[in-house]
Regions:
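Aromatic, loop-rich ligand-recognition surfaces of beta-strand-rich domains
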Residues: 608-673, 686-734
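Structured mid-domain segments that build the active-site/substrate or prosthetic-cofactor binding neighborhood
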Residues: 232-233, 344-443, 449
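Glycoside hydrolase catalytic-domain groove-lining segments
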Residues: 312-319, 326-368
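Short, well-ordered secondary-structure micro-motifs within conserved domains or adaptor modules
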Residues: 69-91
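Feature activates predominantly on carbohydrate-active enzymes
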Residues: 45-55, 59-61, 88-287, 293-297, ...
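Catalytic domains of carbohydrate-active enzymes that cleave complex glycans
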Residues: 420-590
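Substrate-binding cleft/loops of secretory-pathway carbohydrate-active enzymes
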Residues: 302, 306-330, 373-380, 406-414
Length: 734
């Protein structure tokens, strides 16, 4: 018995020694006591492998102080890392990490696989984590020995893009394994390209038949579409495309896609017939793209499934080299796309496209574009949505964030999106915690609690989350006064926790700006607000946005400094006499739609509208406005003004003119004056006081406001051929 035990122990000890010897021989000793023991071998040598080698050497040196030599086409020895050999274990951008006799081989499945293999090695085995531009963590060590490694990985999507100011940092962009459309599409033509290919300024006057027929007439314009059944359009497009590919021989993909705008597709008899045959507007577009794909079989053509082309055709299937860029712009974001009505409409379209194509590019929207510096708690939707895209044959994915500082928790959202685009099976909540602990350090528990409270309050409120939202939409829900007080307490504690670390403190303060902006927006709708307290909040917001270089508050480049200046002018109380304040209004021509319900109060309530039309503003669509104000008694005044909004992206343009008239009895009217507008094609949101002043005061009880609109959107506009809006709010009589 004792003898058997000794034999058993002998064999166990022998096995352990052999196992230890195996693992020791399989290990890759890179650095010992701060001295390089291994080399980096590029095999073969090319720009991608050179970049991968440089990245590895850079971070090994930051960890250990040792600089690994980079050599080419050398025979590997123990301790070396070989970068760039090909592998069949991974697909495009994928990689394999394989230990072999003390040598680690980082193999590529194609494209940037070797770079991403280096990133995986640094993250998983050397403990380096990159969070945002110039922000990473590592643990210094004079010794680096790699264990035996055998793994392979391929991304879920062959193309992965999101926006962040971090993309300006070349290490960040590679670390997040991100790509850019300009690397793929010829001449950077990747979306809304009709007018780039056949400009209306060049062809529109002589050949209006090339462009959409809308409401019975041809409408050439920057945002009009092509008449896709016109054979001359096809031949001209082919000539232009051929010249572009000849000028960019390194590219094989181009977008041939509708101009931005809704409903501007051609409705001529020939195009209408195709639409009826296909059961969808997209049928005409896919037929056209298939003809291009047949003319250029070695090229790939991307086209939009966006707004009026979102639903797939019933008959025609896209050819394999036709890429469908499907956009979910109209969906609400408070829950995953499968869980609300607007999302389910998109999901139905996605499933329809996935039945007829394996070449789908998803364009997803993950921020509030009307107020990027506004809370947008959709983190719980990211993983299920990206998994949905993957299940339905999407091979390319663009998660549209905003790349500017101050965008709501941009750093965390961009980081999480990058991780999930590579592998959508990861747990989003775990990713959030990992990011917060590394980026916000000791402030992480408070900001995590803030995000969870915000998310819970959004869901409990039942209010949808829209990508063109206003904080005012949520002032009774997730941004009510009680919750905002709690949010501020959490931020106060977060700031206190990192007060000794200026860099981390500034990250917390930058992330607080959306809450501060929301409170300012909500405060301006409260006639009983604390004016001095609001002024102090505005001053702090002004100071912090300047400090952190916040460039814009929305996608239309409205700058924070302009917002603060206008806020002081429009929303902070000043002592001025307004005879129209609170006075009743009678409409001769009522506002459009829902605006008729509250317009009579909103025009004289003393509360100015903000940079989005969804609150305080009163609108008329495609027709003129006419209303009277009863001042209550005969008054003396010399100035009348009305406040107008320009928001071109929402089809809200300046009207032609506004005319003011006065009367004692509301029957006989005398002209007071007319203000004539100048056309403005800017995408920036603007306000304009249409003021008329007379040299001598007049006496009257009634003031009439008559606004002449422009009728239809002009040829340069997104809504060419469709009714234009104009919006106004406060009318003042002084």
């Amino acid at each position: 018995m004792v003898k058997n035990m000794k034999i058993k122990h002998f064999f166990i000890l022998t096995f352990l020694l052999l196992l230890s010897s195996f693992f020791a021989s399989a290990q890759t000793p890179l650095v010992k006591n701060g001295k390089a023991k291994g080399r980096i071998i590029c095999s073969p040598q090319n720009t991608v492998n050179d970049e991968a080698a440089s990245l590895l050497r850079q971070f090994v040196e930051r960890i250990s102080g040792a600089s690994l030599p980079i050599v080419h086409q050398a025979n590997p020895r123990k301790g070396d890392i070989v970068i760039g050999e090909s592998t069949t274990r991974a697909g495009e951008d994928g990689f394999a990490l394989e230990s072999d006799g003390g040598v680690l081989r980082i193999k590529s499945g194609g494209d940037r696989g070797s770079i991403y293999g280096v990133v995986e090695l640094l993250e998983r085995y050397l403990g380096v984590t990159y969070y945002a531009k110039d922000v990473y963590t590592l643990t210094p060590s004079a010794d680096i020995t790699l264990p035996h490694i055998d793994m392979a990985d391929t991304p879920a999507f062959r193309f992965r893009q999101t926006f962040s100011y971090g993309n300006d940092d070349p290490v960040y962009r590679r670390w997040m394994r991100l790509e850019s459309h300009d690397e793929l599409f010829a001449a950077d033509m990747w979306v809304h390209t009709f007018n780039q290919l056949l400009p209306a300024e060049v062809y529109g006057k002589a050949h209006p038949e090339y462009y959409s027929m809308i409401n019975g007439r041809r409408q050439p314009g920057n945002h009009s579409q092509w008449c896709l059944t016109n054979p001359e359009v096809f031949e001209l497009a082919c000539q232009k495309i051929d010249s572009i590919f000849r000028a960019h021989p390194d590219k094989h993909m181009i977008s041939v896609s509708q101009n931005d705008g809704n409903g501007t597709y051609c409705q001529c008899p020939a195009c209408k017939k195709v639409e009826e045959e296909e059961g969808a507007v997209s049928g005409n577009y896919i037929r056209f793209l298939n003809r291009l794909a047949q003319r250029f079989p070695d090229k790939e053509f991307s086209t939009l499934a966006y707004l009026f082309t979102m639903d797939p055709p019933h008959l025609t299937k896209p050819l394999p080299n036709v890429n469908i860029m499907l956009c979910d712009i109209d969906c609400k974001r408070e829950v995953p796309l499968t869980d609300n009505e607007s999302g389910r409409h998109f999901v139905k379209a996605l499933e329809g496209w996935s039945r007829i194509s394996d070449n789908i590019f998803i364009w997803d929207y993950v921020i509030n574009f009307d107020g990027v510096v506004t809370p947008f708690p959709n983190f719980h939707c990211l993983q299920p949505n990206i998994s949905l895209f993957k299940r339905n044959h999407a091979t390319m994915l663009f998660e549209q964030n905003m790349p500017t500082r101050g965008t709501d928790f941009l750093e965390m959202k961009a980081w999480m999106l990058a991780k999930l685009m590579w592998n959508p099976q990861q747990d989003a909540d775990s990713l959030m915690l990992q990011f917060m602990r590394g980026y916000y350090r000791e402030a992480a528990p408070y900001l995590y609690q803030y995000q969870k409270l915000l998310q819970g309050a959004l869901l409990a409120s039942g209010t949808p989350l829209w990508i063109y939202d206003s904080p005012i939409t949520h002032k009774q829900g997730m941004l009510n006064a009680t919750l905002c007080k709690t949010y501020n307490q959490l931020f106060d504690r977060a700031e206190e926790a990192v007060r000794a670390d200026t860099a981390v403190l500034n990250r917390v303060r930058l992330s607080r700006l959306p809450l501060q902006y929301s409170e300012l927006e909500i405060a301006r709708t409260n006639p009983n607000r604390d004016a001095e307290g609001t002024r102090q909040q505005l001053d702090l917001f002004d100071e912090r946005t300047r400090q952190f270089g916040v460039r814009t508050l929305n996608e239309r480049d409205n700058r924070p400094e302009d917002y603060c200046r206008l806020y002081r002018q429009r929303f902070l109380p000043v002592s001025e006499r307004n005879l129209a304040l609170g006075r009743p209004i009678t409409f001769i021509s009522e506002p459009s739609g829902r605006y008729a319900d509250f317009g009579a109060n909103a025009l004289t309530d003393g509360l100015y509208g903000g940079t989005t039309y969804v609150e305080s503003w009163v609108g008329w669509e495609g027709r003129d406005a006419d209303f009277t104000i009863d001042l209550g008694s005969t008054e003396s005044f010399s100035e009348v003004t009305a406040d107008f909004l320009l928001q071109s992206g929402a089809w809200i343009l300046w009207p032609q003119s506004v005319t003011y008239s006065v009367s004692d009895d509301a029957r006989e009217w005398c002209p007071f004056g007319t203000y004539t507008f100048t056309e403005d094609r800017s995408l920036t949101v603007k306000f304009l006081d249409a003021t008329v002043t007379v040299p001598q005061p007049v006496s009257a009880r009634y003031v009439r406001v008559s606004v002449k609109g422009i009728g239809q959107c002009p040829s340069w506009h997104y809504g060419v051929g469709y009714p234009a809006w104009f919006f106004l709010d406060e009318v003042k009589v002084r």
